[in-house]
Amino acid sequence: MAFKSDVIFEEIKERIATDKEMVKKVGTSFRMTIAGADGKTKVWTIDAKSDTPYVGDDSSRPVEIEINIKDSDFIAIAAGKMKPDQAFMQGKMKLKGNIAKAMKLRTILDPKMLKAKL
């Protein structure tokens, strides 16, 4: 089963390679474990901290923030139907690391910036 969020991560990969201002604003790294409806998981790493920004499935890279979230909840955030802080407060997003840095996820998942049709 493909994850609906894959299209979002592919778009983030494109943006992080071209939008140097966004990378500078975010300045941190995330490991996101996405859980599918079938119980399978997929890991994505977003590194907007290193000199060479990276988005992909290299789970060995060191990160500052670790996030666990269901694919459907991640899509709701990307679509603007739920804010990342709401997901955290409702227990839909588990977080390990600095919460202030984790809130920079808003910049990456800004629904106004995402082109993918959800």
Curated annotation (Swiss-Prot):
A Pfam family reported for this protein in Swiss-Prot or TrEMBL? SCP2
Instruction: State what protein this is by name.
Output: Non-specific lipid-transfer protein-like 1
**Residue intervals of the SCP2 domain:** 5-113
Write down the species: Caenorhabditis elegans
Q: Which GO terms describe its cellular component?
A: cytosol
Taxonomy of origin reads:
Eukaryota, Metazoa, Ecdysozoa, Nematoda, Chromadorea
Question: Annotated Gene Ontology MF terms?
Answer: lipid binding
| PANTHER family named in the record | SCP2 STEROL-BINDING DOMAIN-CONTAINING PROTEIN 1 (PTHR10094:SF25), STEROL CARRIER PROTEIN 2 SCP-2 FAMILY PROTEIN (PTHR10094)
What's the domain of life for this entry?
Eukaryota
